[in-house]
Regions:
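Acidic, glycine-rich loop-and-beta core segments that form the ion-binding/anion-interacting portion
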Residues: 168-198, 202
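Short, acidic Gly/Pro/Ser/Thr-rich loop/turn segments
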Residues: 62-65, 158-161, 182-184, 235, ...
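Glycine-/charge-enriched secondary-structure boundary and capping motifs
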Residues: 2-7, 24, 112-131, 140-147, ...
Length: 324
């Protein structure tokens, strides 16, 4: 039985190296003026200049959660996942999502499947308050068994409102926003462990929470120093806010039961769990310590389950109460 994500077939380190090889070719593919890149180290979305602001763009897919959702006849929500994985990245740079397009690759045409995917995509865009502008459908039986779903989101942010992590400082408060489950990461390992229990299955395929409305409300009221969308790599996403600091999580959010079950079932080491899954933590917000109470009150009014989970310290990396 697989005890790590790599043993299940996904080597995060190898994936990072492959991505770096791709990104290394990007430098010459730029322009000047409108469309010129605005570089963010480890940013969650790409930014290009446009007038007095910046266009934010990101692309992502749902991954092998699609297979589990298909097995459990829950395909009506994977469109929400697809939107969420993109718009939650956009807001990390301060951008408001405006438009979304999808890409569906199919082994064979399937009208019922497409209707379910479309319903989820539309619901996700409603939750994110962005326009579902179109997309592309490709029937490619030589390439795909079943189907795949991905999408691209575009947003806008004024130049002065870009969140680049430069305001992060020692003693900043870290606020955690609860996830709705594994969201859309770790499913290659999850599928190796899942035993068919319907109650657990419902937890595992719950759609990824969309934080757009609550975070945009927070950005309008509080000076946010940085945001991190906790996706693939788990806690490793926190230093993406600014790698020059140490992120101390000494009061973590409760771990949902599904993660406890996965850990026991697979006999997975805690460090591997926190590297693979969000463990109940969907988004992290860094604010000045003096703004933490007001930020928590606002997030509660917006319907988020949020709490003070830690602080920023001198150093590098992440310290977590469950791993010390």
């Amino acid at each position: 039985m697989a005890r790590t994500y790599a043993e299940a077939g996904v080597d995060i380190d190898a994936s990072d190296r492959a991505t770096a090889a791709l990104v290394a070719q990007f430098g010459s593919a730029t322009r000047k003026g409108d469309g010129a890149p605005i570089t963010l180290e480890n940013g969650f979305a790409g930014l290009v200049q446009l007038g007095a602001g910046a266009l934010a763009v990101c692309t992502d897919g749902v991954g092998t959660k699609l297979l589990l959702a298909h097995e459990l006849s829950s395909l009506e929500t994977v469109g929400i996942d697809c939107v969420a994985m993109n718009v939650n990245d956009l807001i990390c740079v301060g951008a408001e999502p405006l438009s979304f397009v999808d890409y569906v690759a199919l082994e064979e045409p399937d009208a019922e499947l497409m209707a379910q995917l479309g319903a989820g995509l539309a619901e996700g865009c409603r939750q994110a308050n962005c326009t579902l502008s179109g997309g592309e459908t490709a029937v490619v039986p030589e390439l795909v068994r079943g189907f795949d779903l991905a999408g691209t989101a575009v947003g806008w942010v004024t130049r002065e409102a870009i969140i680049d992590g430069s305001r992060v400082a020692v003693a900043d408060a870290l606020i955690g926003l609860a996830s709705s489950g594994p969201h859309s990461n770790g499913y290659t390992l999850i599928r190796r462990l899942f035993d068919g229990d319907p109650a657990l299955g419902a937890q595992l395929v719950a759609p990824t929470r969309i934080y757009v409305r609550s975070v945009l409300a927070l950005l309008a009221a509080v000076e946010v120093h940085a945001l991190a969308h906790v996706t693939g790599g788990g806690l490793e996403n926190l230093p993406r806010m600014n790698p020059s600091f140490r992120y101390v999580v000494d009061n973590p959010l409760p771990v949902p039961p599904a993660f406890d079950w996965l850990q026991r079932k697979g006999d997975i080491a805690p460090v591997e769990m926190y590297r693979t899954f969000n463990m109940g933590l969907g988004m992290v917000v860094a604010v000045a310590a003096g703004d933490a109470v007001r930020a928590l009150e606002l997030l509660a009014r917006e319907g988020e389950t949020a709490q003070l989970i830690g602080h920023v310290a001198a150093g590098e990396g992440v310290a977590h109460a469950a791993l010390d």
